[in-house]
Amino acid sequence: MATGTLTVDLGALVANYRTLDRLGPGATAAVVKADGYGLGAGLVSTGLAKAGACQFFVATAEEGVGLRQVLGPAPEINVFAGHMAGDTPLIRDAHLTPMLNSPKQVQRHRHVLPGHPYGIQLDTGMHRLGVQPADWPALRDQLHDATLLMSHLACADAPDHPQNAAQLAQFRALTDGIQTPRSLAATGGTLMGPDYHFDLIRPGVGLYGGLPFAGARPVVRLSLPVIQIRCVNPGATIGYGATYTATTPRQIATLSAGYADGLIRALSSKATLWDGDTPCPLVGRVSMDLLTVDVTDCDTPPEALDILGPHQTIDQLAEAAGTIGYEILTSLGPRYRRALTP
């Protein structure tokens, strides 16, 4: 049996896409990198394509090849990493559109794949990926056939951060007067308003129900099966390191999931799981394949518990672990059975 069942609410996913799409005046591309933020790129991209999405972004050419096999020849698939050495056959055969990040990538792409579509990523202040402003004047007038000019905001999850306005100004300074379509906003930038929208928005985490899209519908439910329930007496310790000691008689359920499945050790003795409306605290350490949960308050012995679902979002679980919803989502492991609800 799988370590758990990860259910994707396709209706919620599509609703989030359409809500974000209505905010932008131009096109909306779905970001499905990291295996669709951990949910299964094939599942989510197929659902989004049926809902009208025709442009997608992935991190690497290898991800793009897999997506092309699922979606067929029609959609545009863009690659954030650009045209890396060794990627040429993948980009050519899967008809991917790399976002070129440096003069070296521009030279490589135009030399080995002349006439093949490409976009340009510009570094407007994040100092991570993109053509640097000092290198742009020498390239600007040579790249009129680019499909897109894009950049990425470093602080879009904090709308009032001055870095956002600075990057917007830099992006405009680098691209104003060029007829090529432009894109600056992912989920956070989309929510900051029309100044950041340009011709294409690129929502990622907001599609999947994560912050900063506070109005998103929850997309993910993760139910974990109970292997065994035992009664422990006062003074008994639970799990590795004996970090939890029962002070009264407790019913402890052992569940089939652990840090190998993306439930990181930082959740140890901090997370809550749910049996219907009944909260059940995780006790002791998260181990590789197992969790131990106090189910004393459950009316009947549960067969499964929810760690993500109606009572707990990805960001609430992330808060318990001291991390962000992105990490929780993208860590969800391959041992879960993936399922869709319409």
From Swiss-Prot:
Q: Does the keyword Isomerase apply?
A: yes
| Coiled coil residues, start to end | none
Q: Where are the transmembrane segments?
A: none
Its recorded name reads: Alanine racemase
Q: Name one GO biological process term.
A: D-alanine biosynthetic process
EC no. given is: 5.1.1.1
Per the entry, what this protein does is: Catalyzes the interconversion of L-alanine and D-alanine. May also act on other amino acids.
Q: Which gene encodes it?
A: alr
* Residue list for modification N6-(pyridoxal phosphate)lysine: 33
Q: Name one GO molecular function term.
A: pyridoxal phosphate binding
Among the Pfam families in the record, one is Ala_racemase_C
What are its cofactors? pyridoxal 5'-phosphate
Write down the species. Jannaschia sp. (strain CCS1)
**Hey, which pathway is this one from?**
Amino-acid biosynthesis; D-alanine biosynthesis; D-alanine from L-alanine: step 1/1
Look up the record and report any one GO term of the cellular component aspect: cytosol
Family, as annotated: Belongs to the alanine racemase family.
* Isomerase keyword on record: yes
Which keywords annotate this record?
Isomerase, Pyridoxal phosphate
Residues that coordinate or bind substrate? 128, 288
Spell out the InterPro entries in the cross-references: Ala_racemase, Ala_racemase/Decarboxylase_C, Ala_racemase_C, Ala_racemase_N, Ala_racemase_pyridoxalP-BS, PLP-binding_barrel
* Catalysed reaction equations from the record: L-alanine = D-alanine
Catalytic center residues = 33 (proton acceptor), 240 (proton acceptor)
